[in-house]
Amino acid sequence: MVAVQQQVQAAIDEFVASGADDGLQVAVLHEGRVVVDAVAGTADADDVKRVDPSTLFFAASTGKGVATSVAHVLVERGDLSYDQRVADVWPEFGAHGKDGVTLRDVLVHTAGVPGLWPDITPGDLGDWDRVCAFIADQPPWWPPGTRTGYHALTFGFVLGELVRRATGRTLAAVLREEIAAPLGIADELHFGVPAQLLVRVARQGPDGAAPPPPEPGSPLDRAIPSGVQPTAAFANCPDVLRADVPSQGTMSARAVARMYAALLGHIDGIELVSPDRLATMATPTVSGTDQVVGIPTTSALGYSPARPGGVESRPGSTFGMIGSNGSAAYADIDSGVAVAVMRNRIVGDMSAVAAIDRIIADSLG
């Protein structure tokens, strides 16, 4: 296992030395044991503060995998069910024919409510009630359950409000109390970073090879309006980092990898979900053309079922999420690995993750 650590360390050192990245963290657990805990580069724009294992990174949609995991834990414990209708606990959401939308629809992005208002600002994301009221009153873009389309930001609000109404706790509170605290990672896995921990957040660097903004008025532009697109300025905004938005998260690699390892059942006797539940979570469920992004997509129950670096995935075994800033966290049931990669440069490619994933696949499966 020493060789795996050395190979990953050499790879991320090269990414920093080449200028492709400013700072990275990588954590890998295999059957519950840490086999990689590697860092490289700097955490600030002045190249002074070094990345360490406790550095927190804005991880964009990698956070969706964390939010999804909270939902599955709540289903496991009987607090939610996949076929529970959102409107049963959030009546306002049922407007405009959305009364049949279920938790399952939310998880696989078939609910039909991906849009936000055009001039939304980063500060608006912290106004939970306003955003939820807007979504509840939004006519669906398609008959719910009939098509899929990436709910880039609204995913976390719909899921979070369902959790809040059903349990009396925010999704962030459930994450902290039921998952992060028992696993000893409560300071490193966040929806809404506490003010006193903002100093530990790596500053995202220039937008590098980030993809161009969506065409004005396009479905993607309506789902991610210009004011809340994932640029470096957005990711560094204190309002964004402090906001409890379960569509995106701030975390360390070792924390989110430990969470995925716990889902696999390999951490200190802590069983977050049963083996049967785990199999359900990882099973590809919905395929089709994404109505927001416009490309073919396949989803498991809230996760991507593909390995982020192009390594061949095993359907029903691999599950996780990637972020638009090049971060990723995922697990593989068959090989028993849980992997997380955090980066602090907004980039539009997954080259670092691909290189790391290839090392992991060749060494551990």
Question: Across the structure, where does each feature detected by a protein language model lie?
Answer:
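Catalytic loop of the DD-peptidase/beta-lactamase superfamily, centered on the K-T-G motif
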Residues: 1-42, 54-55, 147, 164-172, ...
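Short active-site loop at a secondary-structure junction
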Residues: 13-29, 46-106, 143-153, 244-247
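Solvent-exposed loop/turn segments at secondary-structure junctions
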Residues: 113, 156, 346-347
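Amphipathic, well-packed alpha-helical segments that form the structural scaffold of globular domains
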Residues: 13, 111, 136-140, 160, ...
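Active-site helix/loop module of the DD-peptidase/beta-lactamase fold
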Residues: 53, 58-62, 74-114, 118, ...
